[in-house]
Regions:
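Disulfide-rich extracellular domains of secreted proteins
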Residues: 1-253, 271, 291, 321-334
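Short, acidic/polar linear motifs in exposed loop/turn regions
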Residues: 266-272
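Short, solvent-exposed loop/turn segments enriched in Ser/Thr/Gly
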Residues: 36, 257-263
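Short, conserved beta-strand segments of beta-strand-rich sandwich/propeller modules, principally
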Residues: 114-116, 217, 302, 312-316
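Intrinsically disordered, low-complexity Pro/Gly/Ser/Thr-rich segments with frequent PxxP/GP/PP motifs
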Residues: 285-312, 321
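Short aromatic-acidic-glycine turn motif
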Residues: 185-186, 282-287
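Hydrophobic beta-strand segments
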Residues: 56, 276-281
Length: 334
């Protein structure tokens, strides 16, 4: 059987950029010999000049629903000192509980690129902090997006399933699913109108990305023998989205000159590549490194790097876009 539910918090379409970042620490707080706090910093990489909505979610596993003497802070603002979860589902070894906060006023009060979440707990009864997620949306004229976001708690026994009806049809979209698998023998099967994807060989709380075709619903099913403890697959959140947004396109050409390689690095895309760095690597060692900084659309830079003679060298160009690190490798031999 399945228990619990996921609540649809946000859905829509239009010129909207979105960011969804997760921290999945699976760290035990409280009790004897465990830490009393955990913090994480999320980087704000939205292209939108103003954040329209921001949601913070926290998921924990505990043996009891009584968790006194704890505190959740966001950007040094205390959100709560009481344990009042939105939902708790019972598992074979306790409870899985979720809390969701609208932190839009805090985010918009100060224009910051970093957002800090801190959880403090000095209670006797320990609990496991599994999931901290931050979703932010903002208007951005160059973006075209379609999205739906669910958060809550679902417990799936072996053989049980739950259906999620999407607010509209999605075509060639992605689903980001945060879920807990108790054992490598347990699988989470994601079914849609157009096929199934099996998530397996994973344990603990993880984020999984599933490519979707033409879909109007998701069916989440726990497949497994149940010969493991705990028995339940837990689902914490789902983001289904399709987004079209300007991106950088990095091209690299080179000329060899004895123990050096001269590189021409250009951005032929429609958005800037940030924090561009180029390194040369040979036999597992970094031979040389140069920092280029930002490379705007249409820009190019020429840089010389030292390489190891007589060896195959990897020239790696690294950059960031929307908070994600990307890279391109080319092989050269002097």
């Amino acid at each position: 059987m399945s228990t619990g539910n996921l609540q649809l918090y946000l859905s829509g379409h239009g010129s909207i950029d979105l960011l969804y970042e997760n921290s999945l620490p699976e760290i035990t707080l409280g009790g004897s010999g465990h830490p009393t706090s955990y913090s994480v910093v999320f980087e704000h990489s939205l292209k939108a000049s103003v954040v329209d909505r921001a949601l913070l979610e926290v998921g924990i596993r505990a043996s009891s629903m009584e968790i006194p003497r704890w505190k959740i802070s966001f950007n040094d603002v205390v959100l709560t000192r009481e344990f009042k979860p939105l939902i708790c589902v019972e598992t074979s070894n306790g409870f899985f509980c979720k809390l969701v906060f609208d932190v839009t006023p805090i985010v918009t009060s100060k224009q910051k690129r970093e957002h800090r979440v801190e959880i403090e707990y000095i209670g006797v009864k320990e609990f496991t902090l599994d999931h901290i997620g931050l979703l932010m949306l903002g208007s951005y004229e160059a973006a075209r997006s379609l999205y739906g976001f669910w958060s809550g708690a679902i417990s799936l026994q072996p053989g049980s399933s739950v259906d999620i009806t999407l607010p509209q049809r999605f075509d060639h979209a992605k689903a980001r699913i945060v879920a807990y698998l108790p054992h490598t023998d347990a699988s989470l099967v994601v079914g849609t109108d157009s096929g199934t994807t099996v998530i397996s060989r994973s344990t603990g709380m993880n984020e999984f990305t599933v490519e979707l075709e033409d879909v109007s619903y998701l069916r989440l099913e726990h497949q497994g023998s149940g010969g493991y403890y705990p028995k339940e697959v837990l689902v914490s959140s789902i983001l289904v989205y399709k987004i079209e947004i300007p991106e950088p396109s990095i091209e690299v050409s080179y000329n060899l000159d004895n123990s050096n390689v001269e590189l021409n690095i250009s951005n032929n895309g429609s958005d800037a590549a940030e924090n561009v760095v180029v390194v040369s690597i040979a036999v597992g060692n970094v031979i040389d490194r140069k920092v280029l900084g930002e490379l705007k659309p249409g820009q190019s830079q020429t840089v010389a790097l030292s390489i190891k003679q007589g060896s195959t060298n990897t020239i790696r160009v690294i950059w960031k876009h929307r908070g994600k690190t990307m890279f391109k490798d080319i092989k050269v031999k002097s």
